[in-house]
């Protein structure tokens, strides 16, 4: 399918996906249907549990789906080989629940780490770093090491790192799980700002305060599990 045709379809489409609990006859989810479209802010909400991490693993290609269940721009991901999966993952920015920062490195080096992996020039790295830190208003912490940061500061760094390489979409997996209400609002504001910068956002959360706050500030799609 030509790229211009694919633009009309969702970035991610899940169709009738069923997954079972290990060693159980109980389904984790049954005939799940989900879409993530370009430019949208989608919130996946539900109780904490294994289902959300399993859903993310399918979307990022860590778990291989059955044929005709998970699609990227209408390409059946069941047919992706290892190289296809690696190229696809480069198009995703991920904000992890536990940050996944390198504690010995500075804030800057953590944020630009994806660019280093792609062997970008120093000039390009500096320009992208300056742009993202200004837009997210985190210039004040850029010379610190990550081991000295608070939880919400670490999550701000993680969001900047997820955005630095201009991904097709960002997955934020429970980004406020250990934050108080005020810090939760700040993270919500950063995700809203990321969406305004034309980033497609998929937020996974069980935090109803975060859900209500983001809903009050911007248009969202809500997917309940």
Named regions from a protein language model:
Residues 60:
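Helix-to-loop junction immediately C-terminal to a conserved catalytic motif
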Residues 170-173:
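Catalytic Walker B motif of ABC-type/P-loop ATPase nucleotide-binding domains
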Residues 159:
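Hydrophobic anchor residue at the start of the ABC signature
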Residues 76, 123-141:
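Conserved ABC ATPase "signature" region
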Residues 145-153:
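Conserved ABC ATPase signature
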Residues 166:
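Conserved catalytic motifs of ABC-family nucleotide-binding domains
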Residues 68-77:
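Conserved ABC transporter NBD signature motif
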């Amino acid at each position: 399918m030509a790229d211009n045709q694919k633009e009309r379809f969702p970035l991610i489409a899940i169709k009738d996906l069923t997954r079972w609990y290990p060693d159980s006859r109980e389904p984790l989810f049954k005939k799940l249907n989900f879409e993530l479209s370009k430019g949208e802010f989608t919130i996946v909400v539900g109780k904490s549990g294994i289902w959300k991490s399993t859903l993310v693993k399918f979307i990022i290609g860590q778990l291989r789906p059955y044929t005709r269940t998970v699609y990227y721009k209408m390409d059946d991901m069941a047919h992706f080989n290892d190289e296809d999966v690696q190229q696809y993952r480069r198009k995703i920015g991920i904000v992890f629940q536990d940050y996944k920062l390198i504690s010995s490195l500075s804030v800057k080096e953590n944020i630009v780490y994806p660019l280093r992996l792609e062997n970008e020039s120093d000039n390009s790295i500096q320009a992208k770093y300056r742009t993202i830190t200004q837009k997210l208003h985190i210039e004040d912490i850029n010379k610190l090491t990550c081991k000295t940061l608070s939880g919400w500061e670490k999550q701000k760094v993680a969001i900047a790192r997820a955005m630095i390489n201009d991904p097709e979409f960002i997955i934020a997996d429970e980004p406020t799980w250990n934050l108080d209400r005020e810090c939760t609002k700040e993270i919500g504001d950063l995700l809203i700002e990321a969406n305004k910068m034309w980033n497609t956002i998929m937020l996974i959360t069980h935090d109803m305060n975060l859900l209500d706050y983001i809903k009050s500030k911007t248009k969202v799609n809500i997917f309940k599990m």
